[in-house]
Amino acid sequence: MSWKMALQIPGGFWAAAVTVMLVMLSTPVAEARDFPKDFLVQFKGMCYFTNGTERVRGVARYIYNREEYGRFDSDVGEFQAVTELGRSIEDWNNYKDFLEQERAAVDKVCRHNYEAELRTTLQRQVEPTVTISPSRTEALNHHNLLVCSVTDFYPAQIKVRWFRNDQEETAGVVSTSLIRNGDWTFQILVMLEITPQRGDIYTCQVEHPSLQSPITVEWRAQSESAQSKMLSGIGGFVLGLIFLGLGLIIRHRGQKGPRGPPPAGLLH
């Protein structure tokens, strides 16, 4: 796997980069140009990694007004001119100490930063939350769509599978692409087309690096009568709670009321 990151460069390397840019812009080639009053000079350092730090490549790019004029590529090991303006950058290859410093940046900067990132971003893991819901309420033997929502996980690698009665379902599975939440976590929806039969059990199984074992969430197909009974039971339970609450309120108010005849003075 290849990976790329921007350099976090120690002060010494920044100083070297600024020195190179200033020298480039003060050469005869640069002095012959008609520089505008306002211009932009940039240094961009990038590290490229393959299989961790098995292979590391560092590239330092020197840019004037968004045009790269010179670079140092660790695979080449020397400064190279990209345009006429950067022609004199190759003179820096004669300064052996400075050249060795640039070559050493692969270890001192790239590999160093990789280890630092590995302890924070690269090893960060957040377990996913998994829920199942039908797209609509339908009776048995009617076409429907089950949605497995997998949310708030990191890193992005994830595997979501559907099962019907312990048998994996591959036909009728549709998935969204990974969705970035903007807080370094992801979410994904994996849908399964179904025609549920009485007693069917559908399972969404999720595998992720943050998990010791897969998460499994079940959804059971129910007949209309079973759903009605369940809803009736829930409704009865809620009504019971309401009447119980009203009874307690009435009793509480009754306890606060007068318990004997009012004082005689209040009758006149």
Curated annotation (Swiss-Prot):
Topological relation to the membrane, as annotated: Single-pass type I membrane protein
SS bond list: C47-C110, C148-C204
Spans within the Cytoplasmic topological domain: 251-268
Family affiliation: Belongs to the MHC class II family.
GO biological process, one term: positive regulation of immune response
SUPFAM superfamilies: Immunoglobulin (SSF48726), MHC antigen-recognition domain (SSF54452)
Subunit comment: Heterodimer of an alpha and a beta subunit; also referred as MHC class II molecule. Dimer formation with HLA-DQA2, but not with HLA-DQA1, is required for efficient exit from the endoplasmic reticulum (ER). In the ER, forms a heterononamer; 3 MHC class II molecules bind to a CD74 homotrimer (also known as invariant chain or HLA class II histocompatibility antigen gamma chain). In the endosomal/lysosomal system; CD74 undergoes sequential degradation by various proteases; leaving a small fragment termed CLIP on each MHC class II molecule.
Main localization category: membrane
Entry keyword annotation includes Cell inner membrane: no
Gene label: HLA-DQB2
Annotated source species: Homo sapiens (Human)
Transmembrane portions of the chain: 230-250
Entry protein name: HLA class II histocompatibility antigen, DQ beta 2 chain
